[in-house]
Amino acid sequence: MQQIDIQEKKIDRALFQFVFPFSLKQGTESSISLFLNKSGFKLFQLNQLEDECAYYGDFKVSHRDMEAYYLSFTNKILFPHSEKEKGLHRYSKPLNIRGKLITDTECIPFQIHSVDLTTCPYELGFLTIRTELKPFTSVPLSHSLEFADRFRVLEPRTQKDNSTKIECDGKIYKGAGEFVFNNLFEGLSRFFEGDSKENSYFETFSFFEDERMYVQSLVALEKNEKIDVVDVYRMGSLCGLTVEGKPYVHANNLPYIQDYLQKHAYQRWAPSTYFLIEEHIFTCITIQDERTTPDLANQFYGEFYYGLVLNLFHKIVLLKLANTYTELNIEKDVKEMEKLIYSINSFTANYFSLEIVSQSRSRDIFYLLRKNFNIELLYKEAKQSLESLFRYQENVNAKKDSLLLLILTLYSVVGQMLGMGLVVNDFIGRIKWRNILAYNPVEYFALILAASGVIISLILGIQSLYQWIIDQRNRKKWVKQTVLSSTKE
């Protein structure tokens, strides 16, 4: 089949946010908050308007627009007023450092404006690296795609990955993973689930392909350029440069590309602006405009970023719940089953809603994200799992109650038939030991039956009290894991 002819385009600005989800070690929520404060991170809050220009390079992000975009229920989750409130707690740190991504054929300069760490319930977290290509001369679109494709790789797997190096502050790092965890987030990996990189905290979420970061991008082409469908497809698939340094696209069928865009692209403002959403990328490509580009950047860093993080949070939690359900041994893991029931209910009550966005503007983009992440399907499966667990728990409890009722009924009936009052009278006041020694076999049986009934009642009472205490402790632990992500319960 004939190769598609690629017409190289020049970019004016290229903004990237690389997002990496990770699993926190259990019980480290308080210590990671202290670590971040000591490392120069600051809790992000909407009422701190001075931060509107602090983390985004030349652009300003309106806190008022972010708050207005979401419903009040969602705002409480995304923008908690303090570390003690439930929700997603974002800690930001301005950097404004420059570096170079070096390949066998290219050297691509970039600037990192800031980094975020967001701690979440369910022992989750997100790293965000806010990056921009700021060339001194015009840079081809293929270079920005190659940069994103290589920078997102945290754990090299291929020859292409191993040939990538990053130069920053006079040091050369072997790939993005070493740069991220030995420079940008130095010392953070000790809070990750997994004791070492060999053990690897990267294995926590297997649905993220090859340990790569999610890419959110905004690319503005120069004013005299035009966007075609091949450019949009290359943005979504990160088709940058071949090993020879030439632009490429891994599709030769133009109707296939058009069909792909029908499924994954949002073309309301075409042909000047396209949005495209995939499982690994959320991208916008537009033509540079003095008015449009700042508005898109405001959304890119603001409501679109939080929409992405919220949907990633929903997806990961639902996948974790589904994974826990598949590994559950309901005959043995009774406590794990109760914890799973609580976790699903807590997620529904505290963090999930079908209506999240308050404004019709760009609402379609948010729900396109949900559709591509299969949020509704995952949530439906979680509810089905919950119903199945409830039915099983009801059956087990019904059997236990029936058995207990049978035992108590037998004691009551047999005791009345034997006339326990005859032996009980000998224990009122001073115990009549002579009478006890003179009992016949039937009276001894009645005595043993009465004594065992008292003992069983005491055991059941003590066991119930002990179980109540354990349940309260477990509940506090579950609340801390699923409702709060900070220091206090």
Ranges and model annotations:
Residues 197-319, 323-326:
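N-terminal extramembrane/targeting module of integral membrane proteins
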